[in-house]
Each structure stands twice: as C-alpha cells, then as structure tokens.
Amino acid sequence: MKKWMLGLVAMLVLVACDDGVKKDYLENGNIKSELRYENGKLNGESVWYTQKGQLAVKGTYKDDVLDGTYTRWHPNGKMASEEHYVNGKLDGEVKKWFDNGQLFQEGQYAEGMMDGQWFIFYPSGALAGKAEYKMGTGKQVCYEESGYKCLEVPYVDNLKQGREIYYNPDGRITKIVEYEKGKVVSEENDPQNEEE
C-alpha cells in the first residue's frame, strides 16, 4: 500500500513539474519556443521562434488541442497566415499572405469545413480564383492572371469530387480530370478535339 501511495505522489509531482511556461533555446542562445502547460498539457498561448529569434508561429491551445488563433510568419517577419480553431477544427476566418504582405487567400471555415465565399489572389493582386462553399461542398473557379477562366473544380466534404475542367483562353475545354473523394480516377486530354 505504501509503495502504491509513493508512486501516486511521485506521478503527481511529475505532472505538477510540467505546468507553467517551458522555454527551449537554440544552440546560438536564441529562444526556440515558449510553451504553456497546465496539467501536463499545452494550454494557453504557445510561441515558436526562428533561428534569428523572430516570431515563427503562435497558437492557442486547450488540453493539447488548437483552440483559438493560430498565426504563422514568413522569415522576413511579415504575417504568413492567421486561422481560427475551435476544439481542433478550423472554424472562422482564414487569411494567408505572400511574403510581400499582399493577400494570397481569404475564406471561412465552419466546424472544419470550407464555408461561404473564398478568394485567391496572384502576387499582383489580380483574382486567381473564387469559390462558394456550404459546409465543404461547392465549386472553385480559377482564372489566369490575364483574366480568363482556366479551371473549374467541384468539392464535396473539402475534397475534389467530380469533373475538374481546364479551359484555354478561347473557352475550349483542354483537359478533364475525374475525382472521387479527392483522388484522380481518370484523365482526358483535349476532349473537344476528339469529338471533332
């Protein structure tokens, strides 16, 4: 009985020692990470740094699971992405940026599923794609930087599903790729030429 109690006390001491902020350092002396623990699990805001000591990643956790804002930075210090999580699932606004600060992508998630309007941009700021989703189901339309529609992609449950259709500048179909649950099942090049 005494050994069992002693083992339990030792375990509680070990768990208690894991609480608080744990800082790790790189060989060059710069801080690598500041991780916040409670009851031996990541809880609260944790931060990771680059070799040069700049912010790399900052995330909010609850019991080892992302729950809150998760932000990444490019090596040049500009923000790379900002996402929001609820109980480990993407939920809310998502934004991503090129390393020059220009917006790359913005959209919404609901319970881990793409939801609402999404936009993708070229580094020039020109529209590269747009989509409308309802809980992971919808269609993405992509554009060449010159403005013509070059691609249509259907999605179901956040995965490509159905016919992905490629277009040339004249609007002619140049390729069709068939998807089943995100995996390619067939591919047809220049299907309109075969019909002529």
Describe each PLM feature range.
Residues 15-196:
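Glycine/tyrosine- and acidic-biased, solvent-exposed loop/turn segments at the edges of beta-strands
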Residues 4-14:
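Sec-dependent N-terminal signal peptides
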